[in-house]
Amino acid sequence: MTFVTLCRGHNPGMNPLDLPADIGRVLTDPADTAPFLLDWRKRYVGRARAVVQPSHVEEVARLVGWCAEQRVPLVPQGGNTGLTGGSVPDDSGTAVVLSLARMNRIRAIDPINNTLTAEAGVVLATAQSAADAAGRLFPLSLAAQGSCTIGGNLSTNAGGTGVLRYGNARELCLGLEVVTARGEIWHGLRGLRKDNTGYDLRDLFIGSEGTLGVITAATLKLFPKPAAQVTALAALASPHAALKLLELAQSMLGPALTGFELMSQMCLSLVARHFTDCAAPFEAPHPWCVLLESSDSQSEAHATERFDALMEQAFESGLIADALIAQSIAQSRRFWALRENISEAQAAEGKNIKHDISVPISSIGDFVAATDAALARQFPGVRMVVFGHLGDGNLHYNVSPPLGMNEDTFLAMQDDINALVHDAVAANSGSISAEHGIGVLRRNEMLRYKSPVELALMRTIKDAFDPLGIMNPGKLIG
């Protein structure tokens, strides 16, 4: 990692063993700390004086308070599954990594209030299972749900496949428990759906990537479990056709439409190549494919009847060329595996350049067509691996190298490719980060695309919440 950012007044001569007592488990052996210092994509590797794993909020508060007194940088970390380098320290070796992995308790489930209170280190899949056991649904769902954590989901305002119906992490959170940059504990786990008593502090911490404080627990919204779900794959010619299918599906299914995922043929080809249990779904390849899911509150028969009517209308309108409707839970899971394995398949294929962007839904077709053409002109042979949550305007517009090109040669093009893609995003009034966050990877680009007024306001917030600059320095706003 090339960035080094020291907090204000940092004491560089301190020994790691000067850490205070009663802060939880302390790791200093390189073999123990190594997994916490390398990001998921293996692009960023840092050093730290120690990795600390508290098990209670009071231990977090003691550690943060000590870091504030000693001017020691602190890097909060959840499952370390982020894609922008936001959860690992720089290479100065001055920081303490605060791993929340041991704060992994479900504190409460209230089926009447439809809430679940989970500590920051609870794995997302564990929260989903706890809700399911209580007869409820926690709808946040993403490919890394077996290893990402609630704290990380909230710190990056994670999205996932259910945003179309349920919203992103911010919209699923009712309350937070936070340790401030001064080591104080804010007890905000009230679980209220209405609270008009001033500034919404919760919303400031969500999406702040650990730069304002440490989220230690959250009260989350639960929903009734659907009586039935129907999943289908639809083959079509273009993102423009997918947008028309989305409009039709929303008009016929309304809020029952809970998933609408777009995938290019390149995505499906990579998944079939690198996952032997994920065969190509259709006999003949099609340029694009959509994964649709409907959740029904009445019955399986009612859900199937409505979905069949949608598919019939889509065929009659010429929107889709082929379709497969899952006939079992196992087949539905196979359909979802095609979508969820895309990132892993692209990683297995080799280095790639990722873009987590959003544009107005109505602009997606034109954006993809124009950007594909521009990349093909300026970087002949590059392979566009495009997929994402069409229903909320979020695309993972990734680029893989031409076949046979040296990876280092390809990565040398990264700044130019990023500029082309992100300029196109800006021209469409979009965002260069829809759900992955800014971290280190997008920090300089955010400074380029945000207005001076926005940046000044963000810096004012950062200075107010973290006047010493100890919280995850060098990330997000810098």
Predicted segments — roles?
Residues 184, 443-478:
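Activity-critical C-terminal alpha-helical subdomain
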Residues 3-65, 82-114, 143, 267-279, ...:
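N-terminal flexible segment immediately upstream of the FAD-binding catalytic core
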Residues 27-34, 220-224, 233-236, 243-413, ...:
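C-terminal substrate-recognition/cap domain of FAD-linked oxidoreductases
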Residues 105-259, 471:
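FAD-binding subdomain of flavoenzyme oxidoreductases
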